[in-house]
Amino acid sequence: MRIPFTKMQGAGNDFVVLDETQGRFGLSTAHYRLLADRHFGVGADQILTVRPSPAPGIDFEYLIHNADGAEVEQCGNGARCFARFVRDQGLTAKDAIRVQTRGGVIEPQLNPDGRVTVNMGAPVFELAEIPFDATGLQPQTSGLWKKWPLALVDSGHATTVYVAVVSMGNPHAVQVVDDVDTAPVRLQGPLIEHHASFPKRVNAGFMQIVDRSHIRLRVYERGTGETLACGSGACAAVVAGIRLGLLDDTVHVQTHGGTLTISWAGAAAPVLMTGPATPVFHGEINLPDNL
């Protein structure tokens, strides 16, 4: 079957965007893996799918599949690209839309400067809802929050890291490091992602505090690996930093792919994320009917 697509990127986090507003392509997990494959497919961190409104008061449904083909709840950088795509393709005339994801409703807003702001909703701290199993763990208390110990074992070598856990529609474990350039992201990332305390796996964030309004961040994404940027990861890191008493309520997040601005007023307030969303090219790909 021949599938049209648009390649997009937001702060270096890259996506294949599919329009299923006129009908579904019927793609399998293997199809999504092939689309994301950088050697045999188009290449992307995630595959984003646009579907028609599933309910009154909602403009579109937004599906996300990671590079491993698994469907996930949320993708912040993808949400900005989603909003840019539906406007550029004439699927809506609105600057602000309401979008249903598996992780809840989000509200992207196209700004006059070309950037997109996304209301990502309020962070979730209830451990069962993240989900995070803290059985047998003794946390450290810092600021308004707790940091949880995770025992990591690789090739017989054991270490313990302390993480703050939060859901931004998808689960995140954030640790503070002295220098993101030397942080063991590729070693610890997969160990944290698959840690037994996270029954649905987790995104692992490594945050360096530059000052109270500036952090540097690397994220090892669940099902994808390290990416140039992670929007929901940036939101989770800022929320963690604020709750730990380390950050102010508006923070510039520097990633390898660009800078995002994250604002959070605390408590049950929504997290606002602002950043770029850029079309790269349009194309078509032939996919096997049965895969």
UniProtKB/Swiss-Prot annotation:
UniProt enzyme class: isomerase
Keywords: Amino-acid biosynthesis, Cytoplasm, Isomerase, Lysine biosynthesis
Reaction catalysed by this enzyme: (2S,6S)-2,6-diaminopimelate = meso-2,6-diaminopimelate
Pathway: Amino-acid biosynthesis; L-lysine biosynthesis via DAP pathway; DL-2,6-diaminopimelate from LL-2,6-diaminopimelate: step 1/1
Pfam families: DAP_epimerase (PF01678)
UniProt source species: Albidiferax ferrireducens (strain ATCC BAA-621 / DSM 15236 / T118)
Residues carrying the site annotation Could be important to modulate the pK values of the two catalytic cysteine residues: H172, E221
Any one GO BP annotation for this protein: lysine biosynthetic process via diaminopimelate
Keyword ATP-binding assigned: no
HAMAP family: DAP_epimerase
GO function term, MF aspect, one: diaminopimelate epimerase activity
Binding residues annotated for substrate, in chain numbering: N13, Q46, N66, G76, N77, N170, N203, E221, R222, G231, S232
Name of this protein: Diaminopimelate epimerase
EC number: 5.1.1.7
Subunit structure: Homodimer.
Entry annotated with the keyword Amino-acid biosynthesis: yes
Family label: Belongs to the diaminopimelate epimerase family.
Subcellular location: Cytoplasm
Record: active site: C75 (proton donor), C230 (proton acceptor)
InterPro entries (UniProt xref): DAP_epimerase_DapF
Role played: Catalyzes the stereoinversion of LL-2,6-diaminopimelate (L,L-DAP) to meso-diaminopimelate (meso-DAP), a precursor of L-lysine and an essential component of the bacterial peptidoglycan.
Gene of this entry: dapF
